[in-house]
Structure formats: structure tokens, C-alpha cells
């Protein structure tokens, strides 16, 4: 059952955390830009450019985009929006059938790397309130080369372990459940293949203890901040071939297909009057369909 006490305070607390996490991630990614070896990554280290936007129906957000030498394209976005769901949206949102007003705040990130040896990554966490409230989010890794897309590859093992630690700190049953949900969610039925090697995915997370649920969502964000830079540092010094770059560009096509056909966040943003530039910034900067 949703704890509705001091809902305004909870909204502000969640929003402040997502903005703080954004700042931490952007700072770490800029450090990685500085550390990238110059013999593999020419040019000046990239820096994030922030662009605020307003939603006509209520709220807005800030896009943080970087086109760097290591990070070919990365967006780390925060948004806080509120208003009234359309009847179609209200039918699918817990608590909105009683009252269609809503509030949503969160962070969303997608990184496409220049090196095909460094996996792409997606992470988002969010807090949504109607007459009920809940958290959702997760993180998933998308290696672009076939040999890295195996569950026994070291990067996959370490990525899953990071999220297992985050889950186990709160409930030892959560990781298996949210890992399976991630595998089910990030799957392309028309290709009959997963988008990547998975991670965790959760939604409508409401135990009735807001502080506990918020702490878990914070730990999901911290787990990402711990593991992904570790994997980038592990792989960014490896050289790559033209054939591997080609494989990367083709595999990126799967990313585009998933985000435009199936992704809940994309659909939610477009159907609630979100910022189109921000929503579609998840698209890779270069992609091929052979």
C-alpha cells in the first residue's frame, strides 16, 4: 500500500537525488574522457553541454549531452513533469483511473561509445505519483561484439554482480526477479534476440515503505556509477579493427529498433508531451542496416 504522507517532500527528495546522481555521473564520464589514451582517441576531451527545456503542460527538465572522443554520444537527462494523463494513458497507470493527475521525476542515460570494444549502456531510475506512488528503473549493458555478448564474459559477470549486491542489500529475492524481468523486457521479438546481456529492470516498486524503496533506487544508481566506469577503463585501451567497427554499427541498429518499437520510456515521454529531442537522444550517432 502506498505511503502518501508528505508526498510533496518525497517528490522534492527524489528529484534532488536524481539531479545529484546526474552531476556525479557527468563528472565521472568527463574524467574518463580525460583518461582515454590519445593514440586511440584523437582530439580534445569532451565536455557535457546542458540544455534546459520546459513542458507546456507542466514541468520540464535538463538535457546533458556530450559528443566526446571516448563517448561518441552520451546523454544524461533529468526531468520532472506533472499534469493530467490522457484517458488512454490513465488506464495503464496504477491509481490514475481514480484521478488522472500525475507527477514523474527521474534520470535517464544512454551512452554510445566510439570503441566497439567498450559496451553501450543504459540506465534510468524514476519516481511516479498518481493517487499511488512507486519507483522504477534499472540498468542494462549492450556489448556490440559477439564474443562479448556471452553471459560468461568477464564484463557481463561483473555487471550482474554489481546489481546483485545492490539488490541483496535490500532483499535477496529481488535480483533474480529483476534480472529475469530485464531479460524479458529488453528482447526484440521480431529478431528473436536480446538487446544486450541484460542487467535489472523493475517497475511499480512500492513496498509500502517509501524510505526503503527510495534507498533501493539510490543503490541502483550507485551500482551503475561503480561498475560502468570500471568496465570502460578495462576496455578503452584495447585497439579495434574496421570489421569490429562495422559490427558495432550494425548492432546499433537493434538498439534503434528496440527504442522505437518497444521502449516504455520512449512511449511514455512521447505520449505525455515530453521533450522530443531529449527522448530521441538515445539514438546512436551512426548506425547501419546491411
Swiss-Prot record:
Subcellular location as annotated: Cytoplasm
Gene Ontology MF, one: protein homodimerization activity
UniProt cofactor(s): a divalent metal cation
Feature type site, description Important for dimerization: 190
Chief site of localization: cytoplasm
Pathway: Porphyrin-containing compound metabolism; protoporphyrin-IX biosynthesis; protoporphyrinogen-IX from coproporphyrinogen-III (O2 route): step 1/1
UniProt-annotated binding residues for substrate: 108, 124-126, 273-275
Binding residue positions for a divalent metal cation: 112, 122, 160, 190
Enzyme class label: oxidoreductase
CC per GO annotation: cytoplasm
GO biological process: protoporphyrinogen IX biosynthetic process
Matches recorded under InterPro entries: Coprogen_oxidase_aer, Coprogen_oxidase_aer_sf, Coprogen_oxidase_CS
Active site per UniProt: 122 (proton donor)
Protein's UniProt keywords contain Membrane: no
Region of interest (Important for dimerization), ranges: 255-290
Biological role stated in the UniProt entry: Involved in the heme biosynthesis. Catalyzes the aerobic oxidative decarboxylation of propionate groups of rings A and B of coproporphyrinogen-III to yield the vinyl groups in protoporphyrinogen-IX.
Annotated family: Belongs to the aerobic coproporphyrinogen-III oxidase family.
Subunit structure: Homodimer.
Protein name: Oxygen-dependent coproporphyrinogen-III oxidase
Organism: Caulobacter sp. (strain K31)
Lineage, uppermost ranks: Bacteria, Pseudomonadati, Pseudomonadota, Alphaproteobacteria, Caulobacterales
UniProt gene name: hemF
